[in-house]
């Protein structure tokens, strides 16, 4: 599984071309994962996630609310 990790506010975690920052954010939540800064979305994106990992989803987005 893969997807955008969420901060405590339910929003995607922002980044500006900093893959190492995103890798640390992903691994803090899911130890075996990897991550990078998705350039077009300016958000961290995680890979190698467990199937039950909770990631940002546009249909259940609670960011800012």
UniProtKB/Swiss-Prot annotation:
- What are the cysteine partners in each disulfide bond? 11-63, 15-37, 22-44, 26-46
Alphabetical UniProt keywords: Disulfide bond, Ion channel impairing toxin, Neurotoxin, Secreted, Toxin, Voltage-gated sodium channel impairing toxin
**What does UniProt give as GO cellular component?**
extracellular region
Note the Gene3D superfamilies from the entry: Knottin, scorpion toxin-like
Signal peptide span per the entry? none
Q: What GO MF annotations does this protein's record show?
A: sodium channel inhibitor activity; toxin activity
**Tissues expressing this chain:** Expressed by the venom gland.
**Major localization class:** secreted
Residue span(s) of domain LCN-type CS-alpha/beta? 1-64
- Specify the superkingdom: Eukaryota
Where is the protein situated, by its record's location annotation? Secreted
Gene Ontology biological process terms, A to Z: defense response
The UniProt entry, under Pfam families, shows: Toxin_3 (PF00537)
Q: Tell me the domain comment.
A: Has the structural arrangement of an alpha-helix connected to antiparallel beta-sheets by disulfide bonds (CS-alpha/beta).
- What does this chain do? Beta toxins bind voltage-independently at site-4 of sodium channels (Nav) and shift the voltage of activation toward more negative potentials thereby affecting sodium channel activation and promoting spontaneous and repetitive firing.
**Name of this protein:** Putative beta-neurotoxin RjAa2
> Source species, please?
Rhopalurus junceus
Give the classification, highest ranks: Eukaryota, Metazoa, Ecdysozoa, Arthropoda, Chelicerata
């Amino acid at each position: 599984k893969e997807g955008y990790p969420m901060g405590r506010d339910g929003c995607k975690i922002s980044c500006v071309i900093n893959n190492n920052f995103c890798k640390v954010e992903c691994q803090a939540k899911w130890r075996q994962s990897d991550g990078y800064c998705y350039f077009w979305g300016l958000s961290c994106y995680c890979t190698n996630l467990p199937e039950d990992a909770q990631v940002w989803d546009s249909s259940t987005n609670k960011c800012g609310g």
